[in-house]
Amino acid sequence: MDKENAADAQPATGQTHNDLFDYDVDLDAILGESSTRSNINAPQTSESRGLGLGLDDEVKVTRKRQPIAKLDEGRLLSQAGIPKLRRSAKQKLKFKGKGHEFSDAARLLNFYQLWLDDLFPRAKFTDGLAMIEKLGHSKRIQTMRREWIDQEKPRQRDDDDEPLQEAEGSHHNETSNAADQPSDRQSNSRQSPHPNDDSNDLFMSDEGNPQYVVDRPEAPEEDDLEALLREQEDEVVDKPDGPEEDDLDALLREQADVAVPQQKTSTAPSMDEDRLRVPVDHLYDCDVTHIRNVIVPSNMME
């Protein structure tokens, strides 16, 4: 030990100083030793382990975070939203009517609560209603609301009015055609020669006459027939039944002139009445036979 300490205590010579500054040899040796140590102490990977044991690679499962559900326009307009509410309301929701207002209101609130709980279970009923009220002010919800209201409006009257208008239009056309048919028939009757009178043309059949062929129109419907009957009745009403006023006045005057001479002739005394009339003064002077002759004619006595 003393010898070693004495060797260490010896002063450094020039050779030792040169060895200190000789870095090339020492650095290469140091770098080689560090690389070998790292290779020896390196941990074995999973691939090397699996190849040695015949096992598959380890499957790493990464759990994705589920998105938080929100009550927005898409959820409210989905099949579980307002469309479901409309369908179930038509099928399940029924009211008793007058005298059961409180029970009907409770049934309605319970119905809405169940629907909102299925749609968005994270929120309470009052909070969900507040959120739906805010969403109701958006343009998309308002347009859908108008469409739903229009769908619920009754359209039976409009659907019934369209066939009525079509029927009225067809009826007007048929009546106009029916009104034009008599004029066409008259023009055809004037143009075609007939040996018979016009009065007999309505009742004579023209099947045997090949020169005179008339297109017979089809039988009109009930509405057209009624219209034609009304037109004929109007024509009959317009025609006067009796003579005109001038002819009537003339007839009345003639009857009055005939009645006046009859009255005159009836007021004139007849010969028999003259004979029966005997003055009262001569009754006392005349004889009974004379009175008998005056009262009873001679021919009656015979």
UniProtKB/Swiss-Prot annotation:
One of its GO terms (molecular function) is DNA binding. The keyword Cytoplasm does not apply. Residues 146-158, 231-242 have a biased composition (Basic and acidic residues). Residues 34-48, 175-194 have a biased composition (Polar residues). GO terms for cellular component: replication fork protection complex. It is found in: Nucleus. It comes from the Eukaryota. The keyword Plastid does not apply. One of its GO terms (biological process) is replication fork arrest. Forms a fork protection complex (FPC) with tof1 and which is required for chromosome segregation during meiosis and DNA damage repair. FPC coordinates leading and lagging strand synthesis and moves with the replication fork. FPC stabilizes replication forks in a configuration that is recognized by replication checkpoint sensors. PANTHER family: TIMELESS INTERACTING-RELATED (PTHR13220), TIMELESS-INTERACTING PROTEIN (PTHR13220:SF11). Component of the fork protection complex (FPC) consisting of tof1 and csm3. This is Chromosome segregation in meiosis protein 3. It comes from Aspergillus terreus (strain NIH 2624 / FGSC A1156).
